[in-house]
Regions:
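Short glycine/threonine-rich loop-to-helix capping motif typified by GTGT followed
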Residues: 56-65, 247-251, 284-307, 334, ...
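Conserved catalytic cysteine-centered active-site region
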Residues: 53-105, 112-145, 183-209, 240-245, ...
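Active-site-proximal alpha-helical scaffold in enzymes
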Residues: 81-111, 143-177, 217-223, 334-354
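Extended C-terminal subregions enriched in glycine
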Residues: 256-260, 264-287, 296-299, 328-331
Length: 386
């Protein structure tokens, strides 16, 4: 297979963009991605595009992207894989170039979910990302769904709600330096623990906000990458993992098998181990999910993720900085855009240009998990080709 690199990346601020639609947000992210290509790129050089969008607030996604960006002369494909949509869209673009089909492609992720109340949005998402014969009628919207796992994890491990609060505090702290983050303010452990309960064990500060936003990356084959930059960020590995959809069929509620499978696949393709990862963007839709994911991604042994938190090793400056962007928790979470935005952050990290820079970062990991914990996508990036 041919090697593939990111040569440009861009994203909008994440937040409540009531005045903007998908047709506004997508061009903003695309324009920044094009502007960040060091040696420039012409629209005519883009041969295909993939568009990750979970919702369809503006209608037919792939047609809207083609129309809005004036890319009607190339194939555009919509990708939807619950909250793993963003990194799966990147995976599709990577595979298309690796196969030899194209030399240069565009990957965009976007969603606009703040047009409705949070309660309405939860049910709309659940209808798209749950088993409608079982989980959906039982009311397993996202907080309840993930709470089942995290409650069991807290029961079986030494971790406590204080550790969840410490994850939230860290992500808010990291977001302070990110001008595109939605929640740019600090919180304390005491505030997090005293916040109103959403569903046990999650308080308000354990939950990601719902967000509007878009992100884009431009991918190029190794044969042509020198046309665009002398500082490419290589996509070393990609992986997708799956699991049972209905919760009564899940074997262990204290782990996310899709994450384990996706991480193993991506790391095998990249030729790296968890110890090689210098910085990670982890899918912290809820604080407990970040904690469990430390173990599933191989950063901590079984039931020992709390040690990373207590040692502050997950901060920038620690042994495994996680979510220097602020993560979903504080940066925001437009589902289709989230994974692509993770790649945007890591593109900047690996080029030494991030707002919250991890010194000497060489290898980075992006991670999504979605649906009823039934799908995960992992991408491994590096500023080194091999």
């Amino acid at each position: 297979m041919r090697r593939v690199a990111i040569v440009g990346a861009g994203m909008t601020p994440f937040g409540e963009h009531f005045e903007l639609g998908i047709k506004d947000l997508v061009p903003m992210a695309y324009a920044e991605a094009v502007a960040n290509v060091d040696k420039g790129i012409q629209k005519s050089e883009i041969e295909a595009a993939w568009f990750g969008e979970l919702s369809t607030t503006d209608g037919f996604p792939s047609g809207i992207l083609a129309d809005t960006l004036d890319l009607t002369d190339i194939p555009v494909t919509r990708v939807e894989n619950a909250c793993a949509t963003g990194n799966d869209a990147v995976r599709n673009g990577v595979m298309a170039i690796a196969s030899g089909m194209y030399d240069v492609v565009l990957v965009v992720g976007a969603d606009k979910v703040r047009e409705t109340s949070s309660n309405t949005t939860f049910w709309e998402w659940a209808a798209m990302t749950r088993d409608n014969a079982w989980d959906y009628p039982l009311g397993l919207v996202a907080p309840a769904n993930f709470a089942l796992h995290v409650n069991r994890y807290l029961h079986e491990s030494p971790a406590t709600k204080e550790h969840l609060a410490m994850v939230a505090v860290k992500n808010h702290f990291h977001a302070l330096k990110n001008p595109k983050a939605q929640l740019r303010y600090e919180i304390t452990v005491e505030q997090a623990l005293a916040a109103p309960i959403v569903v046990e064990p999650f308080g308000l500060y354990d939950c990601t906000p719902q967000s509007d936003g878009a992100a884009a990356v431009i991918l190029a084959a190794e044969d042509v990458v020198d046309r665009y930059t002398d500082r490419p960020v290589w996509v070393r590995g990609v992986g997708i993992g799956m699991d049972r959809v209905m919760h009564q069929h899940k074997q262990d509620m204290t782990t996310f098998p899709p994450t384990v499978r996706a991480a193993k696949a991506a790391m095998k393709m990249a030729g790296v181990t968890p110890k090689d990862i210098d910085v990670a963007e982890v899918h912290d839709c809820f604080t407990g999910v970040e904690l469990i994911s430390y173990e599933d991604l191989g950063f901590a042994d079984r039931f020992e993720a709390y040690k990373i938190v207590e040692g502050r090793e997950h901060y920038v400056g620690g042994s495994i900085p996680v979510n220097p962007s602020g993560g979903l928790k504080a940066k925001g979470h437009p589902p289709g855009a989230t994974g692509v935005a993770q790649c945007y952050e890591l593109f900047n990290q690996l080029r030494g240009e991030a707002e919250n820079q991890v010194d000497g970062a060489r290898v980075a990991l992006a991670h999504n998990i979605g649906g009823p914990t039934a799908v995960s996508a992992v991408t491994i990036l590096s500023n080194e080709k091999d």
